[in-house]
């Protein structure tokens, strides 16, 4: 939080990405809702502002357990794919981390095909290997608005 105040991050997403996502939304009937899981209020709000700027509604939760409980509850109400486009999750969180959240999503019959993007300040070969092992669709670094926008575009166009 302090770092965000003394050295603000550019949260501006390129107009090209916004336009490309708007075009996809015109061509396809996509669900304009994304679940965000991050224990950092600052990071959660950054992602939320970015996806709301793309015309999506955000469901924001503070950890993986809360995310999984919300997704499971939604799946009981009907097809999750009619309610949400994708999940963007931090990796390091209390209660349930992003790796475990992804693995639990893949094990749940009503959630298993949900698109999951792991969004983290961590980097390295180990993380990429873990991302692949738990079955996440994508791994992106915090906080690059264009990279986030491109990942959302790939998820909704696929």
Explain the meaning of each model-derived region.
Residues 93:
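Receiver (REC) domain active-site loop signature in two-component systems and cognate sites
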Residues 55-62, 68-71:
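Short hydrophobic/Thr-rich beta-strand motif most characteristic of the beta2 strand and flanking loop
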Residues 1-25, 54:
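C-terminal catalytic ATP-binding subdomain
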Residues 45-53, 65:
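Charged docking surfaces used in two-component/phosphorelay signaling
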Residues 100, 107, 112, 122-141, ...:
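Alpha4 helix (beta4-alpha4-beta5 surface) of REC/receiver domains from two-component response regulators
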Residues 63-66, 82-85, 97-101:
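Acidic catalytic/metal-coordinating carboxylates
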Residues 89-90:
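Active-site T/S-Asp motif of two-component receiver
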């Amino acid at each position: 939080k302090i770092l965000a105040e003394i050295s603000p991050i550019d949260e501006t997403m390129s107009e090209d990405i916004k336009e490309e996502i708007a075009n996809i939304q015109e061509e396809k009937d996509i669900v304009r809702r994304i679940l965000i899981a991050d224990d950092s209020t600052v990071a959660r709000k950054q992602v939320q502002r970015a996806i709301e700027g793309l015309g999506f509604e955000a469901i924001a939760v503070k950890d993986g357990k809360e995310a999984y409980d919300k997704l499971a509850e939604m799946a009981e109400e009907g097809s999750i794919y009619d309610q949400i486009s994708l999940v963007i999750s931090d990796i390091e969180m209390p209660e349930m981390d992003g790796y475990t959240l992804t693995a639990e999503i893949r094990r749940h019959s009503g959630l298993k095909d949900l698109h999951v993007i792991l969004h983290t300040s961590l980097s390295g070969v180990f993380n990429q290997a873990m991302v692949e092992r738990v079955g996440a669709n994508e791994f992106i670094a915090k906080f690059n608005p264009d990279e986030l926008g491109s990942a959302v575009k790939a998820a909704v166009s696929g």
